Design a protein with these regions (language model features):
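Extended, aromatic/histidine-rich regions of cofactor-dependent oxidoreductases associated
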Residues: 2-8, 13, 36, 40-43, ...
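C-terminal segment of N-terminal export signals and the immediately downstream linker at the start
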Residues: 13-14, 35-62
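N-terminal secretory signal peptides and thylakoid transit peptides that target proteins
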Residues: 6-33
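A short, solvent-exposed beta-edge/loop patch
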Residues: 144-191
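Short cysteine/histidine-rich zinc-coordinating motifs and their immediately flanking basic loops
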Residues: 73-80
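Mid-length scaffold segments of soluble, non-membrane domains
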Residues: 90-133
C-alpha cells in the first residue's frame, strides 16, 4: 500500500500533544454530565467480540475527524456493549492508537463496556516506512484482516516511526517481528496491559 504524505497543515508535535491533552480534558469533563443518564441495568456481557470491520470507504476518526485511510500509521476500532457510538451500529474507530486509548479509557469511566478492541497488526501486513517532511511514517492498513485483538499484540513505542498523529503505539501479533522492528528502528516493547493514557500522552 502506498504511503499518504502529510500536507503542510498536518499536525505538528505540539499540535498532537495539545490535541491529546484536549481529548483527555474534554472526556474527563464529560463524565459528570453523563453519569446520571446511565441506566441501572448493565448490558449482558458478550462471550465473543464482533469481527473487525474495514476502516476504508471514507470513514473519519471519531476523535479528530481525519479520514483514516488517507493517513499513515496504525488505526483501531472499539466495540462497546449497548448503543455506543450512538449515531451508528458497529465500532468506534480511530486513525491513531493514542486517540483510541484515551477515548476508550474515558468511555470505561462513563460505564461503557468495551467488548472488543482491534488494532493494526504490523506482523500480518507488508508495511512500508516512508520519509516525508522529516518524519518516518509507517503505512496504514484498513482491511478487516489486517487487524488483531488488542490483547493479542505487543506494542513498539519510542521508535522514531510515526503515524497519523505523530508518535504512536505500533502493534505486532508476533513478538519476534516486534523485536526485529525495535532492533532496526529503536524504542522498546510494551505489553497490552501496560498501555495507559499517561503512556500514550508522553510519546
Amino acid at each position: 500500500m502506498c504511503h499518504h504524505t502529510r500536507s503542510p497543515e498536518a499536525p505538528t508535535e505540539n499540535d498532537r500533544r495539545a490535541f491529546l491533552r484536549g481529548v483527555a480534558a474534554a472526556t474527563t469533563v464529560g463524565l459528570g454530565a453523563t453519569a446520571g443518564c446511565l441506566g441501572d441495568d448493565p448490558e449482558p456481557a458478550q462471550t465473543e467480540p464482533p469481527a473487525p470491520v474495514s476502516l476504508g470507504g471514507g470513514k473519519a476518526c471519531d476523535a479528530c475527524g481525519m479520514v483514516i485511510a488517507d493517513h499513515g500509521g496504525p488505526s483501531g476500532q472499539v466495540f462497546y456493549a449497548g448503543d455506543h457510538p450512538s449515531d451508528r451500529d458497529g465500532p468506534a474507530w480511530y486513525d491513531s492508537l493514542a486517540e483510541l486509548v484515551i477515548e476508550r479509557d474515558a468511555a470505561v469511566d462513563r460505564d461503557r463496556e468495551p467488548v472488543g478492541t482491534y488494532v493494526t497488526d504490523y506482523a500480518a501486513v507488508d508495511y512500508e516506512i516512508r520519509e516525508t517532511g522529516g518524519d518516518r511514517i509507517i503505512s496504514s492498513h484498513v482491511a478487516p484482516d489486517t487487524f488483531v485483538r488488542w490483547d493479542e499484540a505487543v506494542y513498539a513505542v519510542e521508535t522514531g516511526v510515526v503515524g497519523a498523529m505523530g508518535p504512536d503505539l505500533l502493534p505486532f501479533s508476533d513478538r519476534g517481528a516486534a523485536e526485529s522492528f525495535v532492533e532496526a528502528e529503536g524504542g522498546r516493547l510494551v505489553e497490552a496491559d501496560a498501555v495507559t493514557a499517561d503512556l500514550v500522552s508522553s510519546l
